Amino acid sequence: MVEFALIAPLFFFLLFSIIEFGRSVYYIQMLNNAAREGARYAIVHGGPGWRTGCASGPFPATPAYSTAIVCDPNGDKVVAATKAAAVAIIDSTANAFQVQVLWCANDGNIADCPGTHGDGDNGRNQTVKVNVTYTFQPMIAGVVPLPTFTMTGGSTLVINN
């Protein structure tokens, strides 16, 4: 009994630490997957960024069965597609989960993409970059004082439509 009392706290701490580590790796994978799905949505809904009927910026291509232009100047539809792909992240609609969409020139230097949403050019052969950040809260933080930390995921793809 004494041996159990001495070893049990260390054993359970180690056990739950391994579980938390696995959970954090899983969340990182889900963030990368969500960013990739958002970028995939953006690349197949590309088109000229400046068209009559759109104020400015990127928008999905007009569906073949519709005559209306579907504008997405702030990337809200890409953000929605990204959040929908984050199925394993429980609070993906909260402030802990943020998505940034950048449309940039395909010049090999996406780090210099200007502005909040890039340069607004979502034409063919331009790039779209989707960055996802999530504030991870360990489950054992109630027992052991562990801080939250920020995880990131991202995907950069070339627009082909």
Where are these regions (language model features)?
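Low-complexity, S/T/G/P-rich flexible repeat/linker segments used as non-globular hinges
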Residues: 49-50, 131-161
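Sequence contexts marking disulfide-bonded cysteines in secreted/extracellular proteins
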Residues: 53-55, 70-72, 103-116
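Extracytoplasmic
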Residues: 123-127, 152
